[in-house]
């Protein structure tokens, strides 16, 4: 007879191990499948690395603009225009000398060629010597003094002579009345060519090369042409290219630079066409 007994069934522990093995195989298969799928996906472009921002250029610190030094304004009150002893004294038909009989304390003879021996205040005398030497050195021309300081009494005689010759109205355009003359200050000189060319004390002297040099260069030595052409309504006198007035280099240079020709205009004084 055949053996009909049932076969022995695996134990519970064996079945548990089989289950673990099966699930392990399944897990490995799943993981492998996932890996395979990932491998088939297109590779993602790498994220671009951040470009370092350009270093911000440093804003230059503005250099402060230096405050310009103001140009000094000429001090018109540095000297008196009323004191007869001042180099800036203004004497005209409306402004007589404050002291009628004024006589400068520092009058000296001027060592230059002359027609009438000239006396001037020391500073003016020194300046005349320098100016006469300069025109000769620069051009070969020569100057001589025609007239310089006149006292009150001498001016009386001079003015009377012009009145006798021309009549008072015309004399007043040519010569100052006593007490109103710049010659009394010791700061004025009338110059002429050496040798005389026939225009002494006349407007025609302005056409000479001597007068042209004087007009252009007198300021260098502290002089101005006191009665310029075309300024009779202001100064009260006809054109006198030969009549030089010492005011000092500072004022003469300022007037030359600004182009202001008369003391009346420079110091903003009333015109003085008449007495």
Regions found by a protein language model. Name each.
Residues 2-148, 152-275:
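Extracytoplasmic cell-surface/polysaccharide-interacting catalytic and binding patches
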């Amino acid at each position: 007879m055949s053996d009909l007994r049932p076969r022995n069934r695996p134990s519970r522990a064996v079945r548990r191990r089989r289950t673990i093995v099966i699930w392990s195989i399944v897990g490995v298969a799943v993981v492998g499948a996932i890996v395979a799928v990932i491998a088939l996906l297109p590779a993602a472009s790498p994220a671009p690395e951040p470009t370092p921002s350009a270093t911000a250029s440093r804003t230059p610190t503005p250099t402060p603009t230096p405050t310009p030094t103001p140009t000094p304004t000429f001090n018109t009150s540095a000297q008196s225009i009323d004191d007869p002893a001042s180099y800036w004294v203004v004497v005209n038909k409306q402004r007589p000398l404050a002291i009628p009989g004024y006589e400068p304390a520092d009058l000296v003879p001027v060592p230059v060629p002359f027609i009438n021996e000239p006396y001037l205040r020391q500073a003016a005398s020194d300046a005349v010597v320098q100016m006469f030497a300069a025109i000769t050195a620069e051009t070969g021309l020569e100057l001589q003094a025609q007239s310089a300081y006149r006292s009150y009494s001498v001016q009386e005689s001079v003015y009377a002579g012009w009145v006798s010759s021309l009549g008072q109205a015309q004399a007043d355009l040519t010569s100052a009345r006593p007490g109103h003359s710049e010659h009394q200050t010791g700061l004025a000189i009338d110059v002429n060519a050496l040798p005389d060319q026939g225009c002494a004390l006349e407007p025609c002297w302005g056409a000479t090369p001597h007068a042209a040099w004087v007009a252009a260069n007198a300021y260098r030595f502290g002089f101005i042409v006191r009665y310029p052409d075309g300024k009779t309504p202001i100064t009260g006198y006809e054109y006198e290219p030969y009549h030089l007035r010492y005011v000092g280099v500072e004022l003469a240079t300022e007037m030359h630079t600004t182009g202001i020709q008369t003391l009346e205009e420079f110091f903003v004084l009333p015109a003085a066409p008449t007495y």
